[in-house]
Amino acid sequence: MNYIWRDYNPNTMGYIEAWLDESAIQSTGLDDGFRDFYEYWANEDGFAVGENFWCKVAYENDEPFAVIAFCRHEQKTNIMEVVIVPEKRSQGKGSKLLKEFLENAEITGCAIHKSEAVIYPDNIASQKAFENAGFKYSHNHEDQDRESMLYVYDGGVNDYE
């Protein structure tokens, strides 16, 4: 593996909040910050941290540079959020991170055969990162009050249509 992966700890990893610049907030659902997002899902009915909901922080050269939140539901891994530190964006890190995430069961505790992600139409960087990692655009998806796009991964083959 290229990266070191650690479990997110909301009490010691406050630096992730600083990664949420205006661009990141506009392209994610993290208007209230990553910690609030994490606390919401960690306490949501049907979700249990370490059982079907996780957040992992990726490190490169002992420096944290990305966080990924995901859950397991109906034999799929749903990627809920990916945030990369601003100075590492637009360098191919997102697709490399996603590929490593998908290909290494030790990160998630199980092999990922199917995965989904919902991406906003104006988030071109995320669309490219997910496509380069093997995801395919499936269809438009209504996500609360904002139009979104569903991307799917099935070992690199799109059979969701």
Language-model features: where?
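Acetyl-CoA-dependent GNAT
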Residues: D7-G14, W19-E81, V85-E87, L98, ...
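Conserved active-site alpha-helix within GNAT-family acetyltransferase domains
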Residues: S95, P121-H139
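Conserved N-terminal entry element of GNAT/NAT acetyltransferase domains
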Residues: M1-G14, A18, D154-E161
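Conserved beta-strand-loop-alpha-helix junction that forms the acyl-donor binding cleft
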Residues: R89, S115-Q127, Q144-D145
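Conserved catalytic-core motifs of GNAT/GCN5-like acyltransferases
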Residues: E116-V118, G134-Y151
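Active-site beta-strand termini and strand-to-loop segments that position acidic
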Residues: Y59-N61, Y153-G156
